[in-house]
């Protein structure tokens, strides 16, 4: 593809390499390092004048360092006269800080949006935003891609009894996502209502819907400490579910997450590779990964060629 340059930040080079291979491109030359005082240094190693630049950097690992690195890379390309800079952020950082949920709380997702725009980003490509309204925090175009087509494909290919299943949301916020998947599969859906007392602590859970003698498939946009999904799995089994799967777009798996999954009664915990999972998979045999590099690659190709991206909302590209 002419006039396109693809760069990778240091957060998820494996995913960037897969995207580059699917596009038939070499990753652009960039050197990122730290100065002795821990400031981030970025050197773009090739001309980007007049080029359509895409920078892949996920919000994971050392999130603040990686965000700063992304901002510097965007700015470096912008002031080097690139024609357009697109930030490809598979897992958007600070997405859970999207509203004032208590007095004096910051809306950090809006701050990140402002920072990306000020750095010089002309366009954002991301996946399964925690709240889709975050798109409205930007004054530049945002394409929020969905893992749903890849999730549907995985369910059909890997769960033999999927026709006798219930798609379950572990909280009220995910009801829309779950009903969409249930409708596409033509199966039942259920919802777990939770009453939260403190952040990252789950209290009482109430199941709305029927899972008796069915395979329960928990679906959510992210799993962090996994307290919610593991409690939900216990609730579903006690309500008569025959098996429980969890399918989550962003597998953050921080703190006690891995030990909780190992001790929970999941058949499998399935995540996408918006975040690197190799180390986590070594610690937990239940974790399986859906590759979404083809969705990102196709979104980049369509954006570069000025084609519609909405096809990807309902199809998995080959």
From Swiss-Prot:
Residues 212-227 are annotated as: Binding of phosphoribosylpyrophosphate. Transmembrane segments: none annotated. Activated by magnesium and inorganic phosphate. Competitively or non-competitively inhibited by ADP, 2,3-bisphosphoglyceride or GDP. SUPFAM superfamilies: PRTase-like (SSF53271). ATP binds at residues 96-101, 130. Mg(2+) binds at residues 128, 130, 139, 143. Its EC number is 2.7.6.1. The keyword Lipoprotein does not apply. InterPro entries: PRib_PP_synth_CS, Pribosyltran_N, PRibTrfase_dom, PRTase-like, Rib-P_diPkinase, Rib-P_diPkinase_bac. GO terms for molecular function: ATP binding; kinase activity; magnesium ion binding; protein homodimerization activity; ribose phosphate diphosphokinase activity. Keywords: ATP-binding, Kinase, Magnesium, Metal-binding, Nucleotide biosynthesis, Nucleotide-binding, Transferase. It catalyses: D-ribose 5-phosphate + ATP = 5-phospho-alpha-D-ribose 1-diphosphate + AMP + H(+). CDD domains: PRTases_typeI. GO terms for biological process: 5-phosphoribose 1-diphosphate biosynthetic process; purine nucleotide biosynthetic process; ribonucleoside monophosphate biosynthetic process. Pfam families: Pribosyl_synth (PF14572), Pribosyltran_N (PF13793). One of its GO terms (cellular component) is cytoplasm. Pathway: Metabolic intermediate biosynthesis; 5-phospho-alpha-D-ribose 1-diphosphate biosynthesis; 5-phospho-alpha-D-ribose 1-diphosphate from D-ribose 5-phosphate (route I): step 1/1. Its cofactor is Mg(2+). Belongs to the ribose-phosphate pyrophosphokinase family. Homodimer. The active form is probably a hexamer composed of 3 homodimers. Catalyzes the synthesis of phosphoribosylpyrophosphate (PRPP) that is essential for nucleotide synthesis. This is Ribose-phosphate pyrophosphokinase 2. It comes from Xenopus laevis (African clawed frog).
